[in-house]
């Protein structure tokens, strides 16, 4: 049986999602909703609560803003875990290279996976594209870590791992941390290609997200860098590391600019030379280097 575990900002998940699961999973399952409407839990403690109540052989942790877009994915999932004895965890998108610095899984852009990305534009929800990273696709596709919108595990792994609500709080860093725990326990992390998920909202990394990356790096720095599922030369690693560094420099430059423009001194004309112009030029330069313009 598959246990589906959701941390919900409400007392339950939308009826439409329940119906979507029922119509597409194609396997025996139970649904465990951890009610976080009173903001009692971090994502770590909520998922630990879900593990306590789960009865399935496979545990799937999923966001509540997703839609399953293909049928019988649950049956395929059970078959996949039966076929590959070493796999402990699967996801739909992840990285082959995690550098020796605080970094998100997507920062180095050496990725595998697929998902549909949705967004609300001018008050109307629509699918804006399909993210598909196939360059490193093999069967099986090994990765260092996966994205947290959908992750499935063998139940018995939770005798060796747990959602680390001691080192972390809040709602960030949980996916990469648990991925590294799986590798450190002697099991593998794979991309599961036989489910297509539509993610109905795009992530928006803020300061608390980047702080969680610092905690993550301090915890796992002795294992980094880590490469799985492909080979990467030292020169390529250095180049990808620089990409990750530039992404972080860009965020902190934008963060400083936002704080500056919101400051009382700036609004009252305390800065005659308008340092925001300097930050703007810096951000523009970084975006150009990263190919974001």
What are these model-predicted stretches?
Residues 160, 185-211, 215-219, 233, ...:
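Active-site donor/metal-binding and catalytic loop motifs
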Residues 145-146, 155, 159-180, 187-198:
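Donor nucleotide-sugar recognition loop
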Residues 121-153:
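A recurrent flexible, glycine/aromatic-enriched loop bordering the glycosyltransferase active site
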């Amino acid at each position: 049986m598959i246990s589906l575990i959701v941390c919900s900002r409400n007392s339950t998940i939308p009826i439409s999602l329940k119906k979507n699961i029922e119509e597409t999973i194609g396997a025996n399952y139970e649904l465990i909703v951890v009610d976080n409407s009173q903001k009692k839990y971090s994502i770590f403690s909520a998922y630990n609560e879900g593990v306590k109540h789960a009865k399935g052989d496979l545990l799937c942790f999923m966001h509540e803003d997703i839609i399953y877009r293909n049928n019988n994915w649950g049956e395929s999932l059970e078959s996949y875990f039966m076929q590959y004895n070493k796999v402990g965890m699967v996801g739909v998108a992840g990285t082959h290279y995690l550098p020796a610095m605080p970094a998100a899984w997507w920062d180095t852009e050496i990725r595998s996976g697929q998902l549909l990305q949705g967004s609300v534009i001018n008050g109307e929800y629509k699918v804006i594209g399909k993210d598909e990273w196939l360059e490193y696709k093999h069967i099986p596709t090994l990765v260092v870590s996966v994205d947290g919108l959908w992750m499935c595990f063998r139940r018995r792994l939770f005798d060796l791992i747990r959602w680390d609500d001691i080192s972390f709080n809040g709602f960030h860093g949980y996916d990469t941390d648990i991925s590294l725990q799986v590798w450190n326990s002697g099991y593998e992390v794979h991309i599961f290609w036989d489910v297509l998920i539509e993610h109905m909202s795009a992530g928006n990394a803020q300061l608390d997200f980047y702080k969680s990356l610092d905690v993550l790096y301090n915890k796992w720095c002795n294992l980094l860098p880590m490469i799985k599922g492909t080979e990467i030369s030292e020169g390529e690693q250095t180049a990808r590391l620089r990409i990750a560094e530039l992404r972080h420099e860009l965020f902190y430059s934008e963060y400083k600019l936002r704080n500056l423009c919101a400051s009382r001194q700036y609004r009252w004309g305390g800065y005659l030379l308008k340092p925001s112009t300097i930050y703007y030029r810096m951000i523009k330069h970084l975006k150009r280097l990263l190919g974001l313009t």
